[in-house]
Amino acid sequence: MGIFQLLRDRRISSRGPGLHTPKAEPRRRKGLTTGLMTQAERQKQAHQRQAAMRETALWCTGHIRPRTHTHTGTHTQTDRERERNTQRLRDRERRENGRHTHTYTHRHTHRVL
């Protein structure tokens, strides 16, 4: 068996430590249909890899915090909460308390000790 026959055999990589060490399984990163990927898909994958690498670099240098707090904004109001916060109720309170109590303009009082 000549060297070119070995190279032509798909299971054996020409870039290994030696030509005569066949790979047990040609391991692929993602997806078993990499041969059937379109150029656009390949470019998208490459772009995602690049972005991930950039993000990892930023994370390592402490520029971005990891997104661990992902459970925000998932609170659903109960019926009681909902009816307590209806617009009609707030309007009534506003009428009783005087106008513009919903704005934060005159909350701070200046006191000299």
Swiss-Prot record:
Bias (Basic and acidic residues): 77-99
InterPro entries, sorted: FAM27D/FAM27E
Region (Disordered): 1-113
Disulfide partners: none
Pfam (any one): FAM27
Domain of life: Eukaryota
Basic residues: compositionally biased ranges: 100-113
Family according to the record: Belongs to the FAM27 family.
Official protein name in the record: Protein FAM27E3
Organism the protein comes from: Homo sapiens (Human)
Gene it is expressed from: FAM27E3
